[in-house]
């Protein structure tokens, strides 16, 4: 499985951070596989902003800094900033699919980075878009 590149949606991180029983174990396996280098992860800056917002809303600034430090220091994670190309593609995806703009931005980033899978537990993501397959953390965990 080495060399598999995935784009990870916000909810996969939140499943682990919030210990959400339905998705916790499989999402944790996916994130552990990134830590071990079994998977290479692409993380849009939007995902980081969404996660940090939760920490700051709950006045957990120390947890926010810890999360950010972990993301930045992980050599198996590539953080991708929103570019003009990704923004324009996001608008097209939103217009064609009706996805919420943040989801379209994550999908656009995944397409731009030519990842193998878009990992999300969001049932509103299309199963496939422009050749990119969306996969649930449970399905990916079985492949690891």
Kindly label every feature range from the protein language model.
Residues 12, 47-48, 86, 105-106, ...:
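Alpha-helix capping/helix-boundary segments
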Residues 1-43, 56-66, 140-144:
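Short, well-structured N-terminal submotif of metal-dependent ribonuclease cores
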Residues 39, 77, 132:
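Short, conserved active-site loop motifs that form the nucleotide-linked donor/cofactor pocket
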Residues 14-16, 50-53, 89-90:
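A short acidic, helix-capping loop that chelates divalent metal ions and anchors anionic groups
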Residues 46, 50-52, 56-78:
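Active-site-proximal, substrate-binding regions of enzyme catalytic domains
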Residues 78-117, 121:
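Active-site neighborhoods of divalent-metal-dependent phosphate/nucleic-acid chemistry enzymes
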Residues 1-5, 107, 112-144:
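Acidic, PIN/NYN-like endoribonuclease modules and their adjacent C-terminal/linker elements
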């Amino acid at each position: 499985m080495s060399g598999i590149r995935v784009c990870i949606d916000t909810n996969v991180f939140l499943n682990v951070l919030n210990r959400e029983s339905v998705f916790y174990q499989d999402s944790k396996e996916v994130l552990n596989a990134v830590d071990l280098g079994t998977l290479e992860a692409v993380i849009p800056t939007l995902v980081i902003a969404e996660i940090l917002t939760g920490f700051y809303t709950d006045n957990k600034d120390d947890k926010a800094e810890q999360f950010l430090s972990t993301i930045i220091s992980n050599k198996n994670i590539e953080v991708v900033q929103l570019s003009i190309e990704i923004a324009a593609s996001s608008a097209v995806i939103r217009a064609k699919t009706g996805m919420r703009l943040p989801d379209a931005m994550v999908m656009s980033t995944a397409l731009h980075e030519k990842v193998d899978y878009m990992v999300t537990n969001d049932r509103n993501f299309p199963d496939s878009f422009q050749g990119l397959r969306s996969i649930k953390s449970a399905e990916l965990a079985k492949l690891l």
